[in-house]
Amino acid sequence: CVQHLLGDFAFAIWDNSAQKLFCARDHMGIKPFYYTLTDTLFAFASEIKGLLVLPIDRGGINEDRIADYLTCIATENESTFYNNILRLPPGHFLEINTGKSLLYKYWEPQPAQISGSSKFAYEEQFYSIFKEATRCRLRSNFPVGSFLSGGIDSSSIVCMSAGPLRHQLPDQMHTFSGIFNEISICDERQFFQSVLNRYEVIPHFICADRINPSVAYDRTIQLEDEPFWAPHIFMGWELMAIAKQQGIRILLDGHDGDSAVSHGLGLFPELLFQGKWFRLLKECYLIGNTPSLKRTLKNLFRVCWNCTLYRASALIPVTFQPNHFVKTLSRLNPSFEKRNSIRSRLLKAETDRPNDGQREYEHHMSVITQPLHPLALEVLERQCIQHGLIGCYPFFDKRLIEFCLALPAEQKRSNGFNRNIVRKSLQSILPNRIAERKSKTNFTPNMTHIFSTTGKAWLQFNVDKTPQQTYFYLNKEELFNIYDSFQREPSKTSLMDLGFLLRSISLSQWLTNQ
């Protein structure tokens, strides 16, 4: 039956006649499912802490998971930080009966059957699928809310909900946005204001560059049963708190619509391999907001280089080490690195990651099936639960994902615009300011600002009190070098460096509680 289900779910059903337990998790892993299985016991829970209270053997700490966490890769989505506690992977079901268990993948993305091949047929079908994916997530007896950032994903959701679907809402829609008065480079008011001007919604704002992140981080560390990934959780945390105050139960989120729809990067290799040089030059020229001959040639060289490397990698195993991996390895305790073959794990991750030399279908499949997706969704799920909210993600509807997988590359990227199908399909409801936006906001400047002002004392306290057991995994000297560099010039600190500091703190807190 699970093959016929839609939506977000994790459940277990006892089949008395067959004397077996049937467990399943939704397609993208939005709802979590953890379990432990021994010769004499099977136990499951929606949170790891539900298993930790049982008299079970946790199996010790999973050092491979720590290695992946500290090097910021995700190589699979079944293990946890405990050797004897597992995740039920997305799109899988598990059958348990006397003496045996069966883990089965019931779903992986498959291209949908699309009727018609004209751009108008594609646009009509996307509009219909996206409308339905949004509509079926609006069912509530309480006010419905949505994040609104000014990007095309959240804006599309708000415009569809407050526009064509407004009669499906139980009350006027609420939106939740961050504004940046001090770090203006992160401010998106010029974009999301066009949505607020067009639709009747109740907007709510926070000054995201004045937040003290310590509350969100300390509470999340308490909530999470593992070290967590999300570096920018504090803005979402504060917005969820406002949503709770407004009586919201359903909170819509455009989380990672990029992966669901695809930026269409596979168009470049396809044009190159097909010898369509004029179209390739045109698309290279139109990348970004300031086209130039120099930039065009640079983009063209990058396309040719990526395609050459990708073709070569099929014949020659990847053995080189990208600079960011070499830098990451230097931050680990050398003995930890050696006993867990971390270099090999990094090289495998480099081989398996989405490659810009892939054709569009391969690239899109590689992006949408990354193991990182359910890890991020699990953090969001617990954040929502803490605030009495149900997080809903229309772009992660399986019907929409499979439709986008089937689209030709030129429907995803055209004339310099990525996610072209969204822009064209929803042009009747999207403000031009949104539909014609090419840029994507980088929130790193606000991260460095926050942790050098309101969060400075919190960061210093937690780095200084890093427990000794953390250095079984980290290079202490490197940790403090990064921290000292951040203190001297926070604005020049990369997200990679600041993220490493925050992951170190999360790992330290988790190790202390073991």
Question: Which role does the model predict for each range below?
Answer:
Residues 27, 238-305, 376-400:
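Active-site adenylate/phosphate-handling loop in enzymes that bind or generate adenylated species
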Residues 34-37, 157-158, 261, 401-406, ...:
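Short hydrophobic alpha-helical segments that form membrane-spanning helices or hydrophobic packing faces
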Residues 61, 80, 121, 125, ...:
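Generic recognition of stable, solvent-exposed alpha-helical segments in well-folded globular domains
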Residues 213-232, 326-335, 342-346:
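Mobile, glycine- and charge-enriched loop segments
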Residues 53, 83-90, 100, 201, ...:
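Adenosyl-5′-phosphate
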